[in-house]
Amino acid sequence: MQALGRHLLLELFDCDAEALNSLETVKASMVEAAKRAQATIVDVVFHEFNPFGISGVVVIAESHLAIHTWPEYRYAAVDVFSCGDVLQPQTAANYLIEQFGASRASVVELQRGIFLQAAPMPHKPAGAKLSGAKLSVAKLSGAKVSGAKVPVGG
């Protein structure tokens, strides 16, 4: 089986509430996470809610990084979706876990666009390969990590 991309789903618990409620901090952290993962940034859009919370997305040539924060619960939900094999989504995830001071994190990796047979890849350079399909729960940073493994047929 082949997959078009990797999608990390992060749940960050017991974070720094002030950091999660600061538009500048959240935006700068997400942009830096994209850079550290070697992503090509295309656009950055963030919104600050009243009385608290931030939502935003860093659109990258390889897909996106998105975040929704709940400072009142010291919680953030983050997606790091990457197509191709250059981007390093774990690097972005580790950086965000550290930046927001999460003492507990759930990280689940999904393979997106799984094909049972080799498919043409008009969006990739000639000779490029798709990622091998798998699903895993990764231990990142020093935070406690939990998650469930889901079998993928092969």
Where on the chain are the PLM-derived regions?
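Polybasic/polar functional segments that serve as interface/processing modules
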Residues: M1-G154
